[in-house]
């Protein structure tokens, strides 16, 4: 036993110093915490009296002991509750095992309680004062009190089932047959009825009915005509018209497409300024002046109408199909747009002067400007003047041939000779390009003289 201190000795600490530190510091600290320094268990009151702990430290020791006893009792109660619950669902073999564990836990709990009773008696008055000051009085909570009016679950379920089986008020609406057979064409009404569908609420039945007769949809013939007019293509054939009078889909009482109330003046031949204006797609109400009309067309209906398709695209009929195509072709041959005019003006501003082609005897800059896009591009390509540099190019070829012949004959192997050779070539080309740059103003002065 004497060598146990040397087993934990540090290089600069002897076993005697470690033993003294244990006896003077660590042992007293464990005793103040209520732990036996030998067995590392909670100490009893007799041991505390035997070790004569300071009276000022006794409240700390007692609180530690009471907390430990509370945790032990709570643990024992939890184990007992778990064993009781498991005994209801486990087989007989598990019952025997849990009963043994329960007995062992009860014995250990009784031993702990007996050991801690003596240590907690001398501080009972102090503990009572602490509990009264720190723990508020919440009153008595009655958790096991039965409710005053118990709920009859069976009666509640029966009432719920009967409410589900009761007939529900049906929501009346348009049927499939009505949606197919009672759809009138666009010629029988105006577009305002299509935009603002009327609803008639029935207060007695608490349901809303939407009359299908108020829904206005365009006829197939008008849809095909509008698609044909919107494509602006001569290669497309006109779509076949559908005779609504002989069709089985629409009823006999629905008006045909020939009774259209829309009349378009001049097949919607509008100018570019008013084609997309707000007034081109809106009709004035009936209360306005009768002289007001849309630039694109008018309606003879008594209701207000907003027909975007009819005002944006013209209706192309079979009898005047050729006339409408001629009208569309005439619309394309208009004045050039703003950007085309700007491009022509830019090309005219960038035209070369007469001295570029003075040797050829042609003065392209005096050509009248073209106002078409294709002609402006062609004129821009044709007006590119090429300076007459044939003598200078021949001079460059001759000088380069002389340089190459001199380089091969002299066999310039030294760095100095190569340096002088390239420096001479650099200054020669610098002089050539500077002369080529300044020769244009010189030729301009000669032409002015």
UniProtKB/Swiss-Prot annotation:
Localisation per UniProt entry: Nucleus
Keyword field: Activator, DNA-binding, Nucleus, Repeat, Transcription, Transcription regulation
Record bears the keyword Cell inner membrane: no
Top-rank taxon, per record: Eukaryota
GO molecular function: DNA binding
DNA-binding region(s), chain positions: 5-26
Domain HTH myb-type stretches: 1-30
Gene3D superfamilies: Homeodomain-like
GO CC annotation: nucleus
UniProt function note: Possible transcription activator.
Protein name: Myb-related protein Pp1
Native species: Physcomitrium patens
